[in-house]
Amino acid sequence: MVPVVALVGRPNVGKSTLFNRLTRTRDALVADFPGLTRDRKYGRAEVEGREFICIDTGGIDGTEDGVETRMAEQSLLAIEEADVVLFMVDARAGLMPADEAIAKHLRSREKPTFLVANKTDGLDPDQAVVDFYSLGLGEIYPIAASHGRGVLSLLEHVLLPWMDDVAPQEEVDEDAEYWAQFEAEQNGEEAPEDDFDPQSLPIKLAIVGRPNVGKSTLTNRILGEERVVVYDMPGTTRDSIYIPMERDEREYVLIDTAGVRKRGKITDAVEKFSVIKTLQAIEDANVVLLVIDAREGISDQDLSLLGFILNSGRSLVIVVNKWDGLSQEVKEQVKETLDFRLGFIDFARVHFISALHGSGVGNLFESVREAYDSSTRRVSTAMLTRIMTMAVEDHQPPLVRGRRVKLKYAHAGGYNPPIVVIHGNQVKDLPDSYKRYLMNYFRKSLEVMGTSIRIQFKEGENPYANKRNTLTPTQMRKRKRLMKHIKKSK
């Protein structure tokens, strides 16, 4: 399960600044959803190759009376969803009554909480945080979120201990892997393969979308039942339900983010739709079905959720629900809108269905299998290098400082999503347009469908870069005599 970190504190203590720095963006990856407090943001972040979800809660009112209400409305929900809470205070403003009230609430929870003193730039950190020890939350971590000072230390001391279950990417000797495969292929031998067989594993399938777009109806239709489930896994409200199923002799695990879902029992919009459940289901899935309401069209929330799916690198199938009952004219308008707003993801299949009546639902699984097979397909180093060579022959890389960028070889760097690692000289100077050209060339050459391809570039380091020449004693004596001769000639 992907860890969840909540940022809590008074207004203007720097929560959004820290959120943007952690998620490396200037806004939330997933925008506000109907039924949820508007000023809560959700984003995807990473530290040392380990992923986590960050929640930016709105500022809590500055009065003790207001704290109780606002905590119940939004911040308390974020705390319950989180694995770790970062309680932020303003070192410049000093200790405030609202800080004490918030700390009182946090101490009553058994949630790991860490006190972060922001805006310590230009101050003596030890002196600036001394008053906050009275909050009784242990060690204080001074940072300057706007400049990034102390943020890395905060991540290492707070987040990494809670991420043992999310292992970083394995480091391999990529050059050795390349030459081993190349030599084996030149000798007519089969390249060594690992024991991983993606076809032997069930496909984890997540159905996500905004409230009331028909996710539960589609889930019921797939399972052939009148209800999704009448029980939930024990734990917090962010637990999702994993439902094993089989279709056409292929095993699946359906990830249900709806929680307890007896029809007519749930009326609270927040209870119906949990952003955290959705984000964690996306991270855990192999293939994501993004459900869109044909009658409402694509909203900004749909695009924000789509952005999170793409950033997570998951395979994607777009499902346009409630297609029945629309006139032909309206259907054409919907298709034109889809082409216009989703033109940047031409690799994803789009299905028009009616989950209520079942039309088109059976065709979804063909696209799901296609997307899964594309994302887990093993491609040899020799083939990737040949494709790279053909791409270079069709369109040469640009000149950088008068020299042509040289691409040497390519190999697989990961799967789900497929990652192609290209080694060469001056590859860091390649323009984005040429990188997109290479990505599209690989996708078309490999006939990848339902998943994006990521291209990573690695450049050989110059061992003499930023190093002064070291002279032998004989060379030093010659240099000394030469310098004396130059001075005399002047």
Swiss-Prot record:
GTP 2 binds at residues 209-216, 256-260, 321-324. Keywords: GTP-binding, Nucleotide-binding, Repeat, Ribosome biogenesis. Residues 377-461 form the KH-like domain. GTP 1 binds at residues 9-16, 56-60, 118-121. One of its GO terms (molecular function) is GTP binding. GO terms for biological process: ribosome biogenesis. It holds the Pfam family KH_dom-like. Signal peptide: none annotated. Residues 3-166, 203-376 form the EngA-type G domain. Associates with the 50S ribosomal subunit. GTPase that plays an essential role in the late steps of ribosome biogenesis. Belongs to the TRAFAC class TrmE-Era-EngA-EngB-Septin-like GTPase superfamily. EngA (Der) GTPase family. This is GTPase Der. It comes from Salmonella paratyphi B (strain ATCC BAA-1250 / SPB7). The gene is der.
